Amino acid sequence: MDKLQYESIYGYCRVSSDEQAKHGTSLAEQKKTITKMSMYLFEREPDGFYVDDGVSGALDFYKRPDGKKLQNILEPNDVVLVAKLDRLIRRLSVLCSVRDAFNELNIHLFAHDILGGAESISTSKSPNVNMFVNMMGTFAEWDRKADT
């Protein structure tokens, strides 16, 4: 497989509660998954990590402390990696706004739990990938509401 070539590569991690950090997908586990994905896809480690600890995934991405910092440094052809889509978003409307903004700026978003991170979900032209990503976003929103 040819390794993909992009500019800067960033990992984004999020947990919303201490309980989730202990018994869910911890920040350390997310960083480990993202690093492995980066090494596999790009043969290099991420250039940095942005971490929102104790922040709800329902909050608009750009209103989160590190979400905003990440937004401010991203440039065309950069990459954002997440371990799981629900670590990025927990509301379908947030997913749609992030995906559309990233697509418009040619920023590539990869999620390990979507096709093993093998295809950019923000710039994909595949109707099947787009449908699957929307379904995963819907499930993430449903799961957030069902847990409350």
Question: Language-model features: where?
Answer:
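Short, structured surface patches at the beginning of a domain
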Residues: 1-148
